[in-house]
Amino acid sequence: MRVSEGENFKDLKRVVRGSRLHTVCEEARCPNIFDCWNRRTATFMILGDVCTRACRFCAVTSGRPAELDLGEPLRVAESVAELGLRHAVITSVDRDDLLDGGAGIFARTIRAIRQRSPGTTIEVLTPDFQGDFNAVRTVVEAGPDIFNHNTETVPRLYSRIRPKAVYANSLALLRHVKALAPSMVTKSGLMVGLGETEEELVEVFRNMRAHNIDVLTVGQYLRPSKKHAEVARFYRPEEFAALKVQALEMGFGHVEAGPLVRSSYHADEQVPARKSQLAG
């Protein structure tokens, strides 16, 4: 299938290249890149493009990261302003080599965007900061509209798929965000097709709601290469629809579920909808 590169896509690609920035859209080979970029939403990946972890589902390069680029927050903010983005998502590689896990750079990036593009909504998709709540506070106090941290898979599969992470820490992180900022939208995402059962997925949904998570995304895992975890099975569209119904019945304010759904999919639509619900 041939996908058309619209003018918005070309503009964003030009600015990203010219500003020496990274996007997770490209680094993680997201299937929705054309859709999102043409909607003027993008996910910038800060803290470099080399991750200190090597999760078995992720296409991002792992290894020893370079030194911090202290000019990165300003370049991201200038790019957001130049492109007139409606919604900017800021994510990062894991930086377990840094004392604050990169939280300070997240905060500087958020504030720089706010200063130059006050009408742009901002979502952060953070690592787990190794359970450091001080790092979480640093990001929350910068005031993003959405705080996203992905649970990724069910706890039984963590040792195989996400060996350096702890399921309970991911949930606790998002609960702490809500404790610090009750009106901030919290969000998490799951991949399916890694060998989980429906019962395990539903239990994760329950755990998320018990930790006051507002928005859920559920998408099909696609194997980036032969060195990554194999796909156990592909879910049918009606299975995603059923999972969405169950999640909404549990009280999630917004759910995106489908084969190509990723954590930032249609993220620009989630901020006003959920904020109005929380305000009401």
Name these PLM-found stretches.
Residues 46-47, 124, 257:
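Small/polar loops that bind or transfer phosphate-bearing groups
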Residues 54, 98, 157, 226, ...:
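Glycine/Thr-rich phosphate-binding loops of Rossmann-like dinucleotide-binding domains
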Residues 59-76, 80-133, 139-173, 187, ...:
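Core AdoMet radical
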Residues 35-72:
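Canonical Radical SAM [4Fe-4S] cluster-binding loop centered on the CxxxCxxC motif
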Residues 50, 54, 59, 84, ...:
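Conserved functional loop/turn residues at catalytic and ligand-binding sites
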Residues 1-43, 74, 78, 108-119, ...:
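Auxiliary Fe-S-binding modules of radical SAM enzymes
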Residues 31, 52, 155:
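Nucleotide phosphate-binding site architecture
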